[in-house]
């Protein structure tokens, strides 16, 4: 578990760490645990990656959960970012991600993928089967 708010929770046992974003841009003074961060540009990845265990880069694809929130990147721009060492194993792809995107995300050098809308929109037995397929496909990373 990673706390995205209420960073005081990170002092409890079994929490992985904290997640920084625009509302919570800095770790508490003296915090020495796991830190991740949301980034919405390649410039932010360059700025924050070295001080985090990993970062989320979004939106890679048109958002599923946020209607009208389009991708901010082309495949070409992401390939160039990989070649420049910006995208690497510490960068996770977020935004519009489905299992069908895993091969491309992996080939672009991302360390993994973050799914929100693809999971949130599933219910019942469809959810369980879909989750099993995600686990099988995630072996690409």
Please place each PLM-identified region on the residue numbering.
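Glycine-rich phosphate-binding active-site loops on the catalytic face of alpha/beta enzymes
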Residues: 20-29, 56-69, 102-137
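Histidine/lysine/aspartate-rich catalytic loop segments that bind and position anionic ligands
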Residues: 38-66
